[in-house]
Amino acid sequence: MYLLSFILGGLNTLLRQLRLSISSIDFYKDVYKNYQGYGIKYLFTLSFIPSIIYCIFILNYIITLKDYFNGTSSSKVTDNIEYIINQLPKIKYNNSKISVEEVEPIYLYSKNNNKIFVIDTKNQVSNQEKSKVPFVLEENKLKINLVSNTKKHFPSIVNYSEIFKQNEVILTPEIIKKYFADNLLYAPNLFIFFGTPVIILFWFVTFLLERSIIVLLVYGLANLLTTKTSIQTSIRLVMFSSGIPIILQPVIIILIPELSILIQLLQMFTTFLVFVAILQINKSLSHI
């Protein structure tokens, strides 16, 4: 009973701080004068919440893929994968190289008619065109074109010899499904025990580094325009002003990445509240 009361009390305090961080200048005055520490524990707590949500999305996707390749279930996501796999021609793999009998290049499309794969073992497609396709099957390697939220491309290359253990095999949709079924068998457990901690740490470090510039801005302007403000106080103010943006950022990236700009605008607004609070504190001190 005590533990439940402690958790509910902590949750109530956290929700109150989040609400005030986007609505109250007095809240930041209180953080400035009465709060202690750097606010790093607060940042970690907040980054932990969206990280877990992010991990749940990924874990659910991994389980969906695992069930699909094992033939136990299907969904709208896996229907699209099935549609793409069924377009595959017969691919011969021999001594780390692939070849096809059909005329190349061969494009595989999603149900929305987007290019997902291109098979180009003879290197007939330009690099510019290849960069627009997520998966490129060349003669001796698979090229994966990752695209960030800034639309920048980050190609990743995997040699076929790293994927297939046999020296010679004919790749059909059935063999490919079996390959993924075997490799995804323990994927959910591996993700829970290894992937989840990495993602939690990644988001925490990312949020911390992103706020470092804001900390320097607050520290510099606060000391330039008002009374002396310590770096510890500046860090604490920025950590508490970042609550709502931190919680929303991973969720928006997953569900509606087009609205990522709202996170930046919200952070700018809460930082503005911080500056107003500092100016008002300085004004009150000057009248003493």
From Swiss-Prot:
Alphabetically ordered keywords of this record: Cell membrane, Membrane, Transmembrane, Transmembrane helix
Localization per record: Cell membrane
Membrane-topology annotation of the record: Multi-pass membrane protein
Residues that span the membrane, as ranges: 43-63, 190-210, 243-263, 265-285
Primary residence: membrane
GO CC terms of this entry: plasma membrane
Lineage top rank: taxon: Bacteria
Pfam families: DUF1189 (PF06691)
Protein name: Uncharacterized protein RP489
Organism: Rickettsia prowazekii (strain Madrid E)
